[in-house]
């Protein structure tokens, strides 16, 4: 059976940008519900002894939705850090500059893509097969993990439960908080 992955930091560590209350609901209830539901769906199926990644890449319907949301959320928690924010460094910084010309231009591009990502969704920074970066949007539980030649680097969760307690319906303010928490160390590890 799958278990809810622990947060990689204390439940109040992302304050003031993301509150303890948001994490109590988002991690403790929403993320956990996907785990409970997946554990109820897979006994006796071909997915029973597969890894989470294998399930995400070979399932559909309710099994896919719950497995992908477990994976997406765990990736999201790691995309954030109480010691994050600021400008990127290392290979990711070089790749951002190569694609967008500057960190500010990249931020503007990601913000634009995220603000205009309709409904329950995710915005991802991904590495393409040629080594360049791109920003992609996915809806519902969809994830670039299922795309050949695409490596997820960072994500921002745009389901309303990710920000409604702290920011109500003002997604751009939530994104300002995201930039104060973005985990460039995690991004560089994924890019390598």
Swiss-Prot record:
Instruction: Name the keywords, alphabetized.
Output: Iron, Metal-binding, Oxidoreductase
- The record's EC number reads 1.15.1.1
Q: What class of enzyme is it?
A: oxidoreductase
Cofactor annotation comment: Binds 1 Fe cation per subunit.
Needed co-factor(s): Fe cation
Which reaction(s) does the protein catalyse, per the Swiss-Prot or TrEMBL entry? 2 superoxide + 2 H(+) = H2O2 + O2
- What's a Pfam family this protein contains? Sod_Fe_C
GO MF annotation terms: metal ion binding; superoxide dismutase activity
RNA-binding as a keyword? Answer: no
Task: Enumerate the residues binding Fe cation.
Answer: 26, 73, 157, 161
Q: Describe the subunit structure.
A: Homodimer.
For this chain, the family text in UniProt reads: Belongs to the iron/manganese superoxide dismutase family.
Task performed by this protein: Destroys superoxide anion radicals which are normally produced within the cells and which are toxic to biological systems.
- Name by which UniProt lists this protein: Superoxide dismutase [Fe]
In the UniProt record, the gene name given for this protein reads sodB
């Amino acid at each position: 059976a799958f278990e809810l992955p622990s947060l990689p930091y204390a439940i109040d560590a992302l304050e003031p940008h993301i509150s303890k209350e948001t994490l109590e609901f988002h991690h403790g209830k929403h993320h956990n519900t996907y785990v409970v539901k997946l554990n109820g769906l897979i006994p006796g199926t071909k997915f029973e002894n597969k890894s989470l990644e294998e399930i995400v890449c070979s399932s559909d319907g309710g099994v896919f939705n719950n497995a992908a949301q477990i994976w997406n959320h765990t990736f999201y928690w790691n995309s954030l850090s109480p010691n994050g924010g600021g400008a990127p460094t290392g290979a990711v910084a070089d790749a951002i500059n190569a694609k967008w010309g500057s960190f500010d231009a990249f931020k503007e591009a990601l913000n634009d893509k995220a603000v205009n990502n309709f409904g329950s969704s995710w915005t991802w920074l991904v590495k393409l097969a040629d080594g360049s970066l791109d920003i992609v949007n996915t809806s519902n539980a969809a994830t670039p993990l299922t795309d050949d030649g695409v490596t997820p680097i960072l994500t921002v969760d745009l389901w309303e439960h990710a920000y409604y307690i702290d920011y109500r319906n003002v997604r751009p303010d939530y994104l300002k908080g995201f930039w104060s928490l973005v985990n460039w160390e995690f991004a560089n590890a994924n890019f390598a």
